[in-house]
Amino acid sequence: MASNKVSFIFILFLCVLSTAEFGEAQNPRGRKCEDPNGVDQKAKCYIYCNEQGFLGGSCQGYTNHYMCECYVG
């Protein structure tokens, strides 16, 4: 019975990790950006994310709400 509980908790833990986009760094306090296509022509997101300790970033979002999204790799 105890092994069933351990298995259930382990599976639940894996489900939480998979929905949290494990391996992709998220920066909830991002910077607003102007390039709606993720191009980041002025490299504002790239520079901002490097200053935050990430390897890079791009401009993501929807109409009138584009933010820099930083990532690890």
Curated annotation (Swiss-Prot):
Gene Ontology biological-process entries: defense response to fungus; killing of cells of another organism
Localization terms from the record: Secreted
Disulfide bonds: C33-C59, C45-C68, C49-C70
Subcellular location, principal: secreted
Keyword Disulfide bond listed: yes
Domain of life assignment: Eukaryota
Signal peptide: 1-25
Keywords attached to this entry: Antimicrobial, Disulfide bond, Fungicide, Plant defense, Secreted, Signal
GO cellular component terms given for this protein: extracellular region
Family the UniProt entry places it in: Belongs to the DEFL family.
Name of the protein in question: Putative defensin-like protein 33
